[in-house]
A protein has these predicted regions:
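Flexible, acidic/Gly-rich N-terminal and inter-domain linker regions that tether
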Residues: 1-66
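Conserved, mostly hydrophobic/aromatic
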Residues: 58, 110, 167
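Residue-level detector of conserved catalytic or cofactor/ligand-binding positions
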Residues: 192-199
C-alpha cells in the first residue's frame, strides 16, 4: 500500500471514529495474562450489524476531514488544529477493494467533511459508491452519510448504490443549532431526511 495513502487513512480513520453510527470504532486492547486475543484499532475497521443480525466489519473512514463549517460540537470543525487529509475518489475505491480482497472488511462506512459545497461533497461520495459497484463490481455493504444541503438528485443517486443512507441530525431545534453551528441551516438537515425517505 502506498505510504501516502496509508498516512491519509490513519488521519481520516481517526477523524471518522467520532461518528457513532458503528458499534465499535477501533478499540485497542492488549492481550492480558490468562486472556485470549487482543484488539487492534486505529485503522478504520469498525463493526456494525447487518439486517439479518450478522456482525460485519466495515472500513469506517472520511473522504476528507477538511470542512467549511465551524460547528462547536465537531472534532473536524474548521478552527480545530488537527492533521488534515483528503483521499481522492480513486484512492478510496482502491483502498476499499484492497481491504475487501484481503478479507479485512465486508463493506464501507463513508462520511466526509464538507468541502466547497454540500453538492460538491455529496457528488464525490456518490462517485465512490458508483465506482465500487459499477467498475469494480463490489458486492459488499456500503453505508453513506448524506450531506445536509445536498440536492435531492444526488441523494437519490446515492441510494442507487448504497445499502444504507443516513444523515446526522445534530440539533433538533433551530435556535440550538444556531448557537453551536451558526453556518448551518436547520431546514437542510431535515430536507436530507426527507430526500432519503423518498422512494
Amino acid at each position: 500500500m502506498n505510504e501516502n495513502v496509508l498516512n491519509k487513512l490513519k488521519i481520516l480513520a481517526e477523524s471518522a471514529k467520532y461518528d457513532v453510527s458503528c458499534s465499535s470504532s477501533g478499540t485497542v486492547r492488549s492481550n492480558k495474562p490468562g486472556m485470549l486475543g487482543n484488539t487492534v484499532g486505529g485503522w478504520g475497521i469498525c463493526h456494525s450489524f447487518a439486517e439479518d443480525g450478522r456482525c460485519i466489519s466495515l472500513l469506517k473512514v472520511m473522504l476528507t476531514n477538511y470542512c467549511i463549517y465551524d460547528c462547536a460540537y465537531c472534532i473536524n470543525r474548521r478552527s480545530n488544529d488537527l492533521p488534515r487529509a483528503t483521499l481522492s475518489v480513486s484512492e478510496l475505491v482502491d483502498l476499499t477493494m484492497e481491504f475487501y480482497r484481503r478479507n479485512y472488511i465486508e463493506g464501507l462506512f463513508l462520511s466526509s467533511g464538507v468541502v466547497r459545497s454540500p453538492d460538491y461533497t455529496m457528488e464525490r461520495l456518490v462517485r465512490v459508491a458508483k465506482d465500487l459497484r459499477t467498475v469494480h463490481r463490489f458486492n459488499g455493504y456500503i453505508h453513506l452519510k448524506s450531506i445536509p444541503g445536498a440536492s435531492r438528485e444526488l441523494v437519490n443517486e446515492a441510494g442507487l448504490y448504497a445499502d444504507r443512507l443516513s444523515v446526522n441530525v445534530e440539533i433538533p431545534k433551530e435556535e440550538n443549532l444556531k448557537l453551536l453551528a451558526p453556518e448551518k441551516d436547520h431546514k437542510s438537515v431535515y430536507l436530507s431526511l426527507i430526500h432519503i425517505s423518498e422512494p
